[in-house]
Every structure is written in structure tokens, then in C-alpha cells.
Amino acid sequence: MASHLSIRSLSGSSRYLARNKALKFTDLKSIKLREPIVPTHKNFDVSPDHPLWAFFPDGNKSETCFRETVDLDIQSRPWGLPELRRKSFEDLHKLWYLILKERNILAREVRLADSFNERSTHAHNDLDDKLTLTQKRIKQALIERQVAYERVQTFTDNQKEYLSDFEESYINADSSEIVSFNEKLVRLQYAFFGIQPQLEDYNLEEDINVKFVEGLSYVANLKLKRYLSQNPQSTEEFQTPLNGVVEELPFLLRDTEEAIEEVQELRNSGANVVLHKIEVFPFLRNALGKTIQEAYASDEQL
């Protein structure tokens, strides 16, 4: 115990002497001071993958934090509802988030301008209004699809009656109404039969089924009946009805007049064979697959 106390006393004395020791400075004239570092953003390393770069129009390549009016796409217009109705869910989902990203960039720029009270943001606000309108229309297009799908599930028993009524209205529609009816037909064939609006949206293994074949027959004969009603002179030249999926498919992929010409060529060449049930799905998958590949090849050439 005695040795322990002596060590503590010695330790305390050392600290006391250290505190009371006179301070000595070297020659201050020999000390070299570095130049002060001017505060600048260049002194900081920011990762090029930092998420906040998403709030700038050109990402980590952006040279300014605020775009002037001339840098904005003020000549653009909102997407129309008919245009959005033709898009797949994946396209609408992607478009929604691209718009959301642009709106976030605009909101940051407006907030920055407000803090300085020196820059006009009228163009930014006008562009944001256009983007907001497009988002509202995307919601409307999705709601229409959901409602159409739910209605199909609830009144399956009335499908035949509804399709019959639509067929009569479509065939007898005026030329001024046919554009609207064609848009309705696109929604109808998707809601009732799962026929996608765009070729590239097809999953050939899953989408080609009995419902698809039924829808193909309905759409093809519907377009043919309207064409013949509008062109009575063609009734004698073109024999009806259509002879299975081989003759029906052109009406889904092409304009009615082009489809009729193609069917006539098939008939003249003897290629308009009637397929057995087991051959229908493979034929459709193969034909649609070739059409999709041709469309991709054409886009690459452009």
C-alpha cells in the first residue's frame, strides 16, 4: 500500500511541475506560414455517381446550376391522352419517372432563383405545368385500363352483346368518327382479348393464347365488314368470310386495304391454308416474331 501511495504522489508532482514550467518560443521570424486556402468547391471531391446529380439537367456534366429560358424546351407540348392510351404499362411507368425527374430539376432551379430574387422563373413554371398535365393524363390512361379490365371481369356474360353493339356502331360510324372508334377498338381488343397496342410489347409465349385468337378473328372481320360497307363494289371482288388466322393476321398488322391485297395474293398463290388447332399458336408466334424483328431492323436503319 505504501509503494502505491508514493507512485501516486510522484505522478501528481510531475503534472504540477509540468504546468508551472515556463514556456519557451523559438525564433518566430524563422517560422514560415503557408498561404491561406481560399474556400472553393474545387477543394472537395464529389463522386460522379452521387444521387444528388440527378437534380441537375446534365448530371455530373452540368456546367451551371440554373438554366435560363433559352435553355428550356419551352416549345414542347404535353402528351395527348390518345397518344398515352397506345403506350404499354412499362412505357407509361418510364415516362412518369422521367417527368418526375425533370420536375425535381425545375423545382430546385425555381427554389434557387427565389433565394436570390434576381432571376425570372416564368418559363420554368410554365414547363412544370405542361409536365404536370402529362402526369394527370398518364393517371387517366391507367385508370381507364383498370376500369375496363374490372368491367370485363364483372360482366363476362354480357361480352357478346357488348361486342355486337360495338361492331354495329363501328361499321356504321361516319368518317369523322372513325378515328375515335379506332382508339376505342385498341382499348377494347386489349381489355377483352389481351391484344397489345404495340408489337414490341408482346410476350409471344404468354400472350398468344385462345383469347388472342378469338380477338384476332373479331378485329379482322370487324375491319373487313366496315371496309366492304364503305366500298360496296369490292364485295364481288373479295370473297368472305376470312379463312382462319392466316388470312386474319394481316388485318391486325396492316391497314385494311393493304391487308385485303395481301389476302388476295395469298389466295391467288394458294398459300391461304387452314391450319389445324395445334398449328395455330406456333404460326402466330413465328409470324409476329418475324414482324417484330423486321420492325427493329427498320428502326436501326433509320
Curated annotation (Swiss-Prot):
Coiled-coil regions, chain positions: none
Family per record: Belongs to the universal ribosomal protein uL29 family.
Protein origin, superkingdom: Eukaryota
Gene Ontology cellular component annotations, sorted alphabetically: mitochondrial large ribosomal subunit
Gene behind the chain: MRPL4
The organism of origin for this protein: Debaryomyces hansenii (strain ATCC 36239 / CBS 767 / BCRC 21394 / JCM 1990 / NBRC 0083 / IGC 2968) (Yeast)
Name recorded for this polypeptide: Large ribosomal subunit protein uL29m
Subunit structure: Component of the mitochondrial large ribosomal subunit. Mature mitochondrial ribosomes consist of a small (37S) and a large (54S) subunit. The 37S subunit contains at least 33 different proteins and 1 molecule of RNA (15S). The 54S subunit contains at least 45 different proteins and 1 molecule of RNA (21S).
A GO molecular function held by the record: structural constituent of ribosome
Transmembrane segments: none
Major location (coarse): mitochondrion
PANTHER family, alphabetized: LARGE RIBOSOMAL SUBUNIT PROTEIN UL29M, RIBOSOMAL PROTEIN L47, MITOCHONDRIAL-RELATED
InterPro entries in alphabetical order: MRP-L47_sf, Ribosomal_uL29_mit
UniProt keyword Repressor present: no
